């Protein structure tokens, strides 16, 4: 048998030595500034913050818990709702005050009256 040629036969057998030293990039120059002298102002007393509830818009000067505030707001809404102005406002309040059972009975009586009004020839 003859010589066996390999695929890698065309490559040289010498290994190339590569310098694998990491290149160090020069660091940019950092400008260090000295802090400027602090300007002293006339000292004023420290201000205290205020809560939004203390703006004077509330009817109660005392602080209310969230549940109490919700109750007060619901009472105000209820009073305003009851101020039904005019005939239509009163009718609306009557309808709203009806329980569901009465409301369903009214609807059923209206439907019965409509059926009775239909005349068959």
From Swiss-Prot:
Lipid attachment locations (N-myristoyl glycine): 2
One Pfam match: SVIP
Covalent lipid sites (S-palmitoyl cysteine): 8
Biased composition (Basic and acidic residues): 11-23, 73-83, 90-105, 112-121
Bilayer-spanning residue ranges: none
PTM text: Myristoylated. The N-myristoylated protein is further palmitoylated.
GO cellular component: cytosol
UniProt keywords, alphabetically: Cytoplasm, Lipoprotein, Myristate, Palmitate
GO biological process, one term: ERAD pathway
Subcellular location: Cytoplasm, Cytosol
Stretch list, region Disordered: 1-121
Entries under InterPro entries matching the protein: SVIP (IPR031632)
Family membership noted in the UniProt record: To yeast YGL108C.
Entry protein name: Uncharacterized protein new13
Organism annotation: Schizosaccharomyces pombe (strain 972 / ATCC 24843) (Fission yeast)
């Amino acid at each position: 048998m003859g010589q066996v040629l390999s695929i890698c036969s065309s490559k040289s057998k010498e290994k190339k030595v590569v310098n694998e030293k990491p290149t160090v990039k020069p660091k940019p120059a950092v400008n260090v500034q000295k802090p400027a002298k602090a300007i002293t102002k006339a000292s004023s007393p420290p201000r205290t913050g205020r809560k939004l509830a203390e703006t004077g818009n509330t009817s109660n000067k005392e602080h209310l818990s969230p549940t109490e505030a919700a109750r007060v707001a619901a009472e105000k809404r209820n009073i305003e709702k009851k101020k039904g102005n005019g005939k239509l406002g009163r009718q609306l309040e009557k309808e709203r005050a009806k329980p569901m059972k009465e409301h369903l009975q009214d609807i059923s009586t209206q439907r019965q009256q409509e059926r009775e009004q239909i005349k068959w020839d």
